[in-house]
Amino acid sequence: MPSQADQPDLGPVAPSDRPINGFQVLEQVAGLPISTWRYRWEEPRVRHLGPMAQDWATTFGLGENDTTIAAVDANGVTLVSIQALYHLLGELRNEVVELRQQLRALTAKTNK
C-alpha cells in the first residue's frame, strides 16, 4: 500500500485570504448574460443553457482561460450566491414578521 507521502497533494495550493462578498457575486450573477448555445461540432438541434465562457471570465476573473468554465468555479459562484440569497431571505422574513406585528397593532388600535 502506498504511503501518504507517495500520494499527490490535490488540495488547494494557495487558499485566498481575501474574503468573498456573496452579495457582490450575486449581483454579478444577475448581470451575467445567459443564453442557449451549442458547440460548433454539435448538431444544430443540440442546445446548452448558460453563460458564454468569455462573459464568465470577464465577470468573475476565474479559471485558466476565457474559453471554458471550470465546474469548480461554477459550483463556487453558485454556492456563494445561494448563501447570499439565503441571508437576504432571512432578512426579508424578519421584516415581514415585524410588519405583520405593526399591522396587528395598528388594526387593534383602529378597531377599538
How should each PLM-predicted stretch be described?
Residues P8-P19, S35-R47:
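Active-site-adjacent substrate-recognition loops and nearby beta-strands
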Residues Q28-L32, T59, L85-L88:
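Structured segments of extracytoplasmic/periplasmic soluble domains
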Residues L49-G50, N75:
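Residues that recognize and position ribonucleotide moieties
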Residues M1-S3, L10-G22, G63-K112:
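C-terminal intramolecular chaperone/auto-processing assembly modules
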Residues H48-L49, T67:
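Parallel beta-helix/beta-solenoid repeats that form elongated, surface-exposed shafts/blades used
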Residues P19-G31:
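Periplasmic N-terminal gating module of Gram-negative TonB-dependent outer-membrane receptors
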Residues W56:
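Active-site-adjacent helical/loop segments in soluble small-molecule enzymes
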